[in-house]
Amino acid sequence: MVKVNADYLKLKAGYLFPEISRRITEFSSKNPNANLIRLGIGDVTEPLPLACREAMKAAIEEMGTEDGFRGYGPEQGYKWLREIISENDYISRGCEISAEEIFVSDGSKCDSSNILDILGKENKIAVTDPVYPVYVDTNVMTGRTGEANSVGEYTGLSYIPINSENGFEASIPKDKFDLIYLCFPNNPTGAVATKEQLVSWVKYAKENNSLILFDAAYEAFIKDESIPHSIFEIEGARDCAIEFRSFSKNAGFTGTRCAFTVIPKSLKGKAGIETVDLWSLWNRRQSTKFNGVSYVVQRGAEAVYSKEGKIQIKKLVSFYMDNAEIIKSNLTAAGFEVFGAVNAPYAWIKTPKNMSSWDFFDFLLEKANVVGTPGSGFGAAGEGYFRLSAFNSRENVEKAMERIVKLK
């Protein structure tokens, strides 16, 4: 009989969002007339920006001609897209990131998982808690952890708590870690990292020869001009960080699939006594395992940076952030303790009356027909919290707030 990857069997339970779907399905089967409002999974709802749609339509027509047809593209992404990303997202902010250091992909979720392909299993790993489940689960699946304890913490991983008690600030560890996952603006808490905090992290990483995996998927939602949008705004980060970005939330590409990862050519790692550059390893990995993002989609992503695209993206981001403000203001006025939802599209809510995260999930589902995300699904430190997403229509967000406020 064929042998399986037994590390998958160590996963504590079903992935968070499939478990949510299971509970919704069970509830809906018993309550077929319930009008559910979903503020759980962070999927966008508004149409693709016009500039992106028009660019993709033109690309489709181009592909219908002999001269314009394209087959396999470069695994790293087309040069014209990488150059415009470099100019707009990095050079404009004083970051020395070249087009060659940008790898276009079909999602930051994939990249933050696949990056483990080029990193050794012996690395000591730290994650924030609560945390985007993919960081933890992919380490489990690739044999980098032991078993989980009763609250879902795995041996082999170290957890850095971020909560209301510490102002949602990820404290610099006293111990040495080789690999550190940071996500700011943070999913799920909505917290941000100041420049001073990121300077401290870069200093720590350089002193300990650590690698920071920095997820900046929500950078477009930052309103505070003092908050960095990229780890590479910090001096020295080129030597200790990889950054993941995505078009999913700012441009509505969750169903279109386009993202990118930045790996500076100066970034080094160890293979025994030999020093190797991570850029070359990732380039080799992508060339072997990835055929690139479609030409049509990359033209759509390119349009994000056009004059019209920038206006439309700004409007789209503002729409979701207005939703976030509606959630935060309504729930705060109703007596809930609400964090985030200022520089990120997520509201992180303290559950009332010491309810558990899943009990509050079931309570809102049954009493208000509103779906959110239990904080405990993001880690032990998320217990007693609940995440609501701003990704929905204005009508649904306002209606959901009316329902929840009535319960209070």
Curated annotation (Swiss-Prot):
Keywords: Aminotransferase, Pyridoxal phosphate, Transferase. Belongs to the class-I pyridoxal-phosphate-dependent aminotransferase family. LL-diaminopimelate aminotransferase subfamily. Its cofactor is pyridoxal 5'-phosphate. GO terms for biological process: lysine biosynthetic process via diaminopimelate, diaminopimelate-aminotransferase pathway. NCBIfam families: DAPAT_plant. This is LL-diaminopimelate aminotransferase. Pathway: Amino-acid biosynthesis; L-lysine biosynthesis via DAP pathway; LL-2,6-diaminopimelate from (S)-tetrahydrodipicolinate (aminotransferase route): step 1/1. Homodimer. Substrate binds at residues 15, 42, 109, 132, 187, 291, 387. Pfam families: Aminotran_1_2 (PF00155). The modification N6-(pyridoxal phosphate)lysine is found at residue 249. It catalyses: (2S,6S)-2,6-diaminopimelate + 2-oxoglutarate = (S)-2,3,4,5-tetrahydrodipicolinate + L-glutamate + H2O + H(+). Pyridoxal 5'-phosphate binds at residues 72, 108-109, 132, 187, 218, 246-248, 257, 291. It comes from the Bacteria. Disulfide bonds: none annotated. It comes from Prochlorococcus marinus (strain NATL1A). The keyword Transferase applies. Involved in the synthesis of meso-diaminopimelate (m-DAP or DL-DAP), required for both lysine and peptidoglycan biosynthesis. Catalyzes the direct conversion of tetrahydrodipicolinate to LL-diaminopimelate. It is an enzyme of class 2 (transferase). InterPro entries: Aminotransferase_I/II_large, DapL/ALD1, PyrdxlP-dep_Trfase, PyrdxlP-dep_Trfase_major, PyrdxlP-dep_Trfase_small. GO terms for molecular function: L,L-diaminopimelate aminotransferase activity; pyridoxal phosphate binding. Its EC number is 2.6.1.83. The keyword Transferase applies.
